[in-house]
From Swiss-Prot:
<keyword id="KW-0999">Mitochondrion inner membrane</keyword>
<comment type="function">
    <text>Component of the ubiquinol-cytochrome c reductase complex (complex III or cytochrome b-c1 complex) that is part of the mitochondrial respiratory chain. The b-c1 complex mediates electron transfer from ubiquinol to cytochrome c. Contributes to the generation of a proton gradient across the mitochondrial membrane that is then used for ATP synthesis.</text>
</comment>
<comment type="similarity">
    <text>Belongs to the cytochrome b family.</text>
</comment>
<feature type="binding site" description="axial binding residue">
    <location>
        <position position="97"/>
    </location>
    <ligand>
        <name>heme b b566</name>
    </ligand>
</feature>
<dbReference type="InterPro" id="IPR027387">
    <property type="entry name" value="Cytb/b6-like_sf"/>
</dbReference>
<keyword id="KW-0249">Electron transport</keyword>
<keyword id="KW-0479">Metal-binding</keyword>
<keyword id="KW-0679">Respiratory chain</keyword>
<dbReference type="Pfam" id="PF00032">
    <property type="entry name" value="Cytochrom_B_C"/>
</dbReference>
<feature type="binding site" description="axial binding residue">
    <location>
        <position position="182"/>
    </location>
    <ligand>
        <name>heme b b562</name>
    </ligand>
</feature>
<feature type="transmembrane region" description="Helical">
    <location>
        <begin position="77"/>
        <end position="98"/>
    </location>
</feature>
<keyword id="KW-0830">Ubiquinone</keyword>
<feature type="transmembrane region" description="Helical">
    <location>
        <begin position="178"/>
        <end position="198"/>
    </location>
</feature>
<keyword id="KW-0496">Mitochondrion</keyword>
<dbReference type="GO" id="GO:0008121">
    <property type="term" value="F:ubiquinol-cytochrome-c reductase activity"/>
</dbReference>
<protein>
    <recommendedName>
        <fullName>Cytochrome b</fullName>
    </recommendedName>
</protein>
<feature type="transmembrane region" description="Helical">
    <location>
        <begin position="33"/>
        <end position="53"/>
    </location>
</feature>
């Protein structure tokens, strides 16, 4: 009699995905972040579900309902801050996951990579709409500024913005539809993540060397289930520490003021995880140009497989491109800092230079360095 996990139609899928899955024996801790993203998503869906039980998507009561959750609901404050800071942890894991993919050449798996980019856009849209729901000052003005960017689209722009708003400004209709989308999108993300995993298991995982690892594979369970469990413990420890000791560290104080359409905050800015893209948007004086740069700052990831010039997949043995990669990381941190600063000298010029450097490294310098490294290998 065969083992039930190998014969049962449902268990067989789970077995091939998480138990008997042949995995390279040398994948490092950078490969933990995929499973951590799964944990973050489950956590966000669960905490979000409990928050939705007490939240009201109406402009007159939304802010009060969030206050009610924090003050009157049993452990409501805990659930609310788990959800808010869980989003931050989600993005930290997401950025590391994408960064790992860039470093080790995982973008060679085209289907997996492209679904990953779609996932990233979907997660960003979900987070943006979630930020609008508490209906604080930054919620309202963030929604107004970001949705207004669509008016830069030629001909249909203004009509499109009013259609999204459901009126002539961000109001009750906007809040209601944002809540509806914010509720449904995580389930779409879960479905896309399953497809992402499906395509990954068609090819098998990449590994730090970027070489073929078919000759040296080990079963996923118990080796990587245990390793993922350690990552999960560290993630939960970090998140709980953040929630219990510094719950408002990553939030904006302006969001503790109820939304007021008659009073504009001095500095309108999104959550910290969008600041790099916001800085790129602001660095271009033209509205349409800024919007295009904003979209391209993420969409540029889709070009990575086409821009790969090196004969080696990973950056493990490529010191020149390695240096460029870490300059890119530093540049993204600079953009994140600039995105949170007011639009004045010297921040404007720093933002513009950092934006130029961001696109230059990916589009020009990395392909050239790959070509140079090929030449150096030939010389040896």
């Amino acid at each position: 009699m065969t083992n039930i996990r190998k014969s049962h139609p449902l268990f067989k899928i789970i077995n091939h995905s998480f138990i008997d899955l042949p995995t390279p024996s040398n994948i490092s801790s950078w490969w933990n972040f995929g499973s951590l993203l799964g944990i973050c998503l489950i956590l966000q869906i669960l905490t979000g579900l409990f928050l939705a039980m007490h939240y009201t998507a109406d402009t007159s009561t939304a802010f009060s309902s969030v206050t009610h959750i924090c003050r009157d609901v049993n452990y409501g404050w805990f659930i609310r801050y788990l959800h808010a800071n869980g989003a931050s942890m989600f993005f930290i894991c997401l950025f590391i996951h994408v960064g790992r993919g860039m470093y080790y050449g995982s973008y060679a798996f085209m289907e997996t990579w492209n679904i990953g980019i779609i996932l990233m856009f979907t997660v960003m849209a979900t987070a943006f709409m979630g930020y609008v729901l508490p209906w604080g000052q930054m919620s309202f003005w963030g929604a107004t500024v970001i949705t207004n960017l669509l008016s830069a689209i030629p001909y249909i722009g203004p009509t499109l913005v009013e259609w999204i708003w459901g009126g002539f400004s961000v109001d009750k209709a906007t809040l209601t539809r944002f809540f509806a989308f914010h509720f449904i999108l995580p389930f779409i993300i879960a479905a896309l993540a399953t497809v992402h995993l499906l395509f990954l298991h068609e090819t098998g995982s990449n590994n730090p060397s970027g070489l073929n690892s078919d000759a040296d594979k080990i079963p996923f369970h118990p080796y990587y289930t245990l390793k993922d469990f350690l990552g999960m413990l560290l993630l939960i420890l970090t998140l709980i520490s953040l929630v219990l000791f510094f719950p408002d560290l990553l939030g904006d104080p302006d969001n503790y003021m109820p939304a007021n359409p008659l009073n504009t905050p001095p500095h309108i800015k999104p959550e910290w995880y969008f600041l790099f893209a916001y800085a790129i948007l602001r660095s271009i004086p033209n509205k349409l140009g800024g919007v295009l740069a904003l979209i391209l700052s993420i969409l540029i990831l889709a070009l990575l497989p086409l821009l790969h010039t090196s004969k080696q997949r990973s950056l493990m043995f490529r010191p020149i491109t390695q240096t460029l990669y870490w300059i890119l990381v530093a540049d993204l941190l600079t953009l994140t800092w600039i995105g949170g600063q007011p639009v004045e000298h010297p921040f404007t010029i720093i933002g513009q230079l950092a934006s130029i450097l961001y696109f230059s490294i990916i589009l020009i310098l990395m392909p050239i360095s790959g070509y140079i490294e090929n030449k150096i290998i030939k010389l040896n």
